[in-house]
A protein has these predicted regions:
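Pyridoxal 5′-phosphate
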Residues: 1-249
Length: 249
């Protein structure tokens, strides 16, 4: 369903957009128009999620890249032995494998919240998991891609805060079906994909609290994400450009 649920492409509409796509972020009149449209889309995503600022919306190539961005850019710098990374047995591999891998790289413990026979998370296991060490990450999907289970987001995010952990939410399945307010949820990061919302493929977005994004290292390096390049050092652009290297998706 990750690719079969997307709408059919209107070839003529795509062809009509080519002149603008080719001119994106280039300093010429067409580029200015394309950039304005690009940033207008960012504001629409901000409003859709009720994020506090456009600076908190990073465009990516999909939910998978968004979640990997957090796992690598935050996880590699903040996890270590004695820390615990928590996800669930309901989660898509995109919100499971990156955390498993980064936990292994950093020496952190990787733990999952099990699922009962009704397809619900066994929240009674949270106390046991908390006893494994210092919980630093709680990653989960709002809605399971396999069973359609609606996970108790408020409870999981509250537990993450109690543990002093960040919360990372996969909203790919939920975004087409329910309103999402990141400020009301209180999550630290949230990822979604355009094609789940009848948009184009290979386009996604990551919401991240500005205070966290500012402290994170870049995930990809290259054009459009730098402020200045010198032989001795390179400085990064402001949010969200710091995480948007290369040609826009």
């Amino acid at each position: 369903m990750a690719v079969t649920a997307q709408p059919r492409l209107d070839v003529e509409a795509v062809r009509a957009d080519f002149p603008y796509l080719e001119e994106l972020v280039d300093g010429r009149p067409l580029a200015d128009r394309a950039t304005a449209g690009f940033e207008s889309a960012r504001e629409k995503v901000r409003a859709f999620l009720n994020a506090a600022s456009e600076r908190e919306i990073v465009f990516t190539r999909g939910t998978t890249e968004s979640l990997n961005l957090v796992a690598y850019a935050w996880g590699l710098d903040n996890l270590g032995p004695g820390d615990v990374v928590v996800t669930t047995d309901l989660d898509h591999h995109s919100n499971y494998v990156p955390w498993q891998y980064v936990a292994g790289r950093t020496g952190a413990t990787f733990a999952t919240i099990p699922v009962d026979d009704q397809g619900e998370l066994v929240l009674e296991e949270l106390d046991r998991i908390a006893g494994l060490g210092h919980v630093k990450v709680v990653a989960f999907g709002l809605v399971s891609n396999a069973l359609g289970t609606v996970n108790p987001a408020a409870r999981l995010i509250a537990w993450a805060k109690e543990q002093g952990a960040i919360s990372v939410v996969d909203a790919a399945q939920a975004a087409p079906h329910r309103a999402i307010d990141v400020q009301a949820l209180g999550c630290d990061f949230l990822a979604l994909s355009a094609h789940k919302l009848c948009g184009p493929t290979s386009v996604g977005a990551l919401y991240g609290r500005a205070a966290l994004l500012e402290r994170m290292s870049p995930f990809n390096l290259g054009g459009h994400m730098i402020r200045q390049v010198r032989p001795d050092r390179t400085t990064w652009g402001e949010l969200p450009a710091k995480f948007e290297a290369g040609t826009a998706p």
